[in-house]
Regions:
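A conserved beta-strand-to-alpha-helix junction within the catalytic ATP-binding
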Residues: 75-87
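Short beta-strand/loop element within the Bergerat-fold HATPase_c
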Residues: 136-148
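Detector for a conserved hydrophobic position within an alpha-helical segment of the HATPase_c
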Residues: 192-193
Length: 219
């Protein structure tokens, strides 16, 4: 029963992901056309370049959704650069009251990743951290390089997670927010564990003090 139920859930996941990608496709095409129109009308390149960045980001998200359910290709990349890119992206779109601190080892750390999917995970955890801190606090991102494994710890100074919810938060539909589907952490778990053969879990959390998520990857 459990295997058939899991297969059924997988089909639902894949169906939702591909439908989301399909639904995003048409408005994205329109946005690209409108951007060209604004350029022809002489809008400042400062504005159009920022709009283009976000359109490209939407296209990346669409690509991510369309790939759910198929085996992603992994390429050995510098994790420092991937994390830096994700942190910078979220930083420019969050309050000045959120402090980001990325700590990396002196030597580069490389691991096989599907970069778009992995960035999805990091950005999702960072956004959750910002929500948990109500847009005011500090987020530390630390990389530890040990033998055949890489450990990535993302720590916030937010409201914390009760121990009884450490595993529940990774289940589809779980959310403490009034908005959204509560799919972010569940998707993150699938991406790390099923596609990257890694682990993601709550390392520790204290109520009203903060939470640390840990990602473990093989090198």
């Amino acid at each position: 029963f459990s295997n058939s139920r899991k297969a059924e859930q997988n089909q639902v996941w894949v169906g939702m992901a591909k439908e989301t990608a399909h639904q995003l496709g048409t408005p994205l095409s329109s946005l690209v056309a409108w951007l060209e129109f604004l350029r022809l009308k002489g809008m400042s390149s400062d504005y159009t370049n920022e709009i283009e960045k976000d359109i490209n980001r939407l296209q990346t998200i669409t690509e991510r959704f369309s790939k759910i359910g198929s085996a992603p290709s992994l390429t050995k990349v510098n994790i420092h650069e991937v994390l830096k890119h994700s942190v910078e992206y979220i930083k420019t779109r969050s309050s000045d009251k959120v402090i980001f601190d990325l700590k990396v080892p002196a030597t580069e750390v490389w691991a096989p990743l599907n970069v778009p999917l992995f960035e999805w995970v990091i950005e999702n955890i960072l956004k959750n951290a910002i929500d948990a801190m109500s847009g005011n606090g500090k987020i530390d991102v630390n990389i530890t390089n040990q033998h055949q494994f890489v450990y990535i710890d993302i720590c916030d100074t937010g409201k914390g997670i009760p121990k009884s919810s450490y595993k529940t938060i990774f289940k589809p539909g779980f959310t403490t927010k009034s908005r959204g589907w509560g799919l972010g952490l569940s998707l993150s778990k699938r991406i790390i564990e099923e596609y990257h053969d890694g682990q993601i879990f709550v390392k520790n959390s204290e109520m009203n003090k903060g939470t640390t998520f840990r990602i473990v990857l093989k090198k």
